[in-house]
């Protein structure tokens, strides 16, 4: 289990350094959960960049969709043999224990991340416009922030509202940073 979390920390540090630094600012008891969630985000975000074949990216993303079902399912379920899936399963069930376990909202947010990336992979052309980009940023980055807030015990409408705006801003900034000139 420890090596799975170490893998998550390494992946986030290597591929999303800003998020790594932000996660270090969280209280110690919430860092591993946040790192597992952020590593999940890294893995799903890199699915498209890992191959030039869209169908292979879709296969990888559908695998992550199944991994979410296992990670957010029954506590006794066995996650797929991938360090991020193992850490995600453990972190979700440990951190969400105080709120009655992993619920529908957690599955909804995790699935929103994967589903948005699947829709992106299925596009044969550039995104159709700003509303698509806003929705994509909301479903990927804002959903991730909702999960982290919830894992930290923050259940507040104002915090969720701020996370929605911040998630869209981070998502659009990342899209712009990755755009080719």
How should each PLM-predicted stretch be described?
Residues 1-168, 172-181:
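Acidic catalytic motifs of isoprenoid enzymes
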